[in-house]
Amino acid sequence: IGGYSLQQTRSEGFVRGALLITAGSLISRILGVFYRPVAQIPLGEDGLAMVSPPNAPYMLILAISSTGLNVAVSRLVSQRLAVGDLRGARRVVRLSSTVLGIGGVIFSLLFAFAAPWMARVQGFPEATPGFLALAPAILMVTLEVSLRGLYQGMQQMRPAAMTMVIEQLGRVIIGLAGVFLLTPIALNLGAAAFNAGNTVGVFLGLVYVVYIYMRDRPMKNWTTVAPGVESWEKLSTWQLMREI
């Protein structure tokens, strides 16, 4: 179809893809079960109390900046590939990457600058380092979203599944190492290391998916449009944003 084929994208098929996502999610959850209980050994109840304040605003900002966009990008890429509009699919990925990247920078900076205020409002001014540790993760998550959406739109679920596992491994290993190393120095630094584990995990997941993208260059040959198909490449930025 318009130069696009399942062989070109090495599609793994819906069933296999679903199994990969399920397996990745399961492994990620199993690893996560041990994270908090082990961290509690050096942190204690007081340290864990400082871990929680940054999480609520962090999750709220992620919900505003990126939740659902992974699915939206995936759906639109899949739709354009199905009709042979490879140029349109490429534009969806590029525009979403640009918009998400800009949004990620803005929200990360806002989160970092507001960190002392958010910590004071929640009654834990000593948790400010934890807020700062999470700020870069917002940008990295938004960058990762469009690439994961690209691969899921191509019915390639392995990158998404592997990303989940890599993120959780990084979170647990680096986070716990930081907790055990920094808690003896200062309790709030140990708590911040717990939060920083999340950022490191997201960073490793982003590195992996970027590596896969640079290795495969999946959009390299997305230069054609099937006869009779109106390409989304011709849509204005505003029109395409409304679709996303």
Task: Give residue ranges: language-model regions.
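N-terminal membrane topogenesis motif
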Residues: 1-33, 91, 231-244
